[in-house]
Amino acid sequence: MLALRIEDQFTKDEIVAFYLNRVYFGAGAYGLEAASRRYFGRPAKNLTLYQAAMLAGLLRSPSRDNPHSDPDRAEARTAVVLRAMVEAGHISEAQAQAANKAKTTVMPPPELSGPRYFTDWIVDLLPNYVTVGQDDLVIRTTIDGELQDEAERVLTSALAKEGPAMGVRQGALVAMAPDGAVKALVGGADYRASQFNRATQAKRQPGSTFKLFVLLAALEHGYRPTDRFLDAPIALGGWKPRNYRDQYLGQVTIGDAVALSLNSVAVRMSEAVGRGRVAAMAERLGLKGPVRRDPSIALGVTETSLLELTGAFAVLANKGRAAAPYAILEIKTRKGQVVFKRRHGPGARLLRDDVVRDAHGVLNAVTTRGTARRAGLPQPAYGKTGTSQDHRDAWFVGYTSELVAGVWFGNDDRKPMKDVTGGELPARVWGAFMRAALPGANLKPLDSDQDEGPAPAARR
């Protein structure tokens, strides 16, 4: 319906102009004019055929086809655009050959400042709030400058100092208030080298961080942290999941199994509760899915983003209420007309109080005597580590009563890291960030003062 209304009000040329004036071309450039000056140092009206084709080629993937980060890929993409122009009859074969022969000189990348990955995410969100042709806008966001600077510092420092030895080239960090207000977002090691946002765009296997949803489904179904499951080798059909280092402890409590991230117990819990309930819990707390429902669901084979996963943990910090990540507080035109203003209020209740309290206790044990001991936060903290198969992804997502943060490390080509686990580098970086973000804070434990609200009845 919106597309039809736009076509009724504007000509095709006007619609194209609106689009080109706002679309992202990479390297921090929004709109054709800005991109022309950013890449070639000239106004758009003076672009050569080759330069125009290169900018057109950026629209498909402004980070991956970017001449700053991958000149060869950008040239190959430009050749594809020129060939398409020939086939469409817009230019001749001779013009295309001449353009390819002449090529161009690209301006060096600028020194970029500010939360570039966060800004890109805001631009991606804008179509949800404004329509094509909207006046220039003033946007008020949730970003906290000091937390953003600290997030960038700890992530890039860890990658520079420890990444080469560990075979880690990329990472991401997201921090948000318990209600989902994003305070810091870092989407990669170096924005100038790659504008691909690993915090919002990358979909990766969360590994054992997904056990959060197994735990919550079990607690909601009537299990308690002190209930016991067998920790021993298990086979489901032809699938034989294994514990880390093939170590098994026999009968263990649910609390100990989560704290120590025992795979065999997670699988047994998922089968006992029902994979459908586990998947439904993940979707309820914000994973976009589709969530796989095969036996391996318990070990985090469903790909998700760091932003989604951190938002799911925020539900617990928010006392069981919805905490969908958000970044835009208000949008105004330059003349001061309010286009959008976020309404504040308690989110919908997603989890019962008893489920939240029990989960806090279990997830606190992860940080005090479990796999995330290296986080080293002096205040009460809660979270879950995760490592995907062959050490391709390493995660830690955790929270306090004041702040929720998620950290991911891995490689864009999914090449395995050198034995990096969620309880190692991610947990340490998370701890460093949280200590800087909450210096000397006297935080109240989250296992008390739960508010009341309707929720599904317990059943086992």
Where are these regions (language model features)?
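Glycine-rich, acidic and aromatic/proline-enriched surface loops and short helix-turn segments
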Residues: 21-28, 45, 49-61, 121-124, ...
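Active-site loop and adjoining helix of the penicillin-binding protein/serine DD-peptidase-beta-lactamase fold
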Residues: 3, 7, 59-77, 135-147, ...
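Surface-exposed patches in mature extracellular/periplasmic domains of secreted proteins
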Residues: 14-16, 90-97, 133-139, 161-171, ...
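Short, well-structured active-site flanking segments
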Residues: 30-32, 92-95, 193-196, 219-237, ...
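Conserved catalytic neighborhood of penicillin-recognizing serine enzymes
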Residues: 1, 45, 109-118, 124, ...
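A penicillin-recognizing enzyme superfamily signal
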Residues: 141-164, 173-175, 185, 190-196, ...
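Non-catalytic, structured segments within soluble enzyme domains
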Residues: 1-149, 153, 186, 280-284, ...
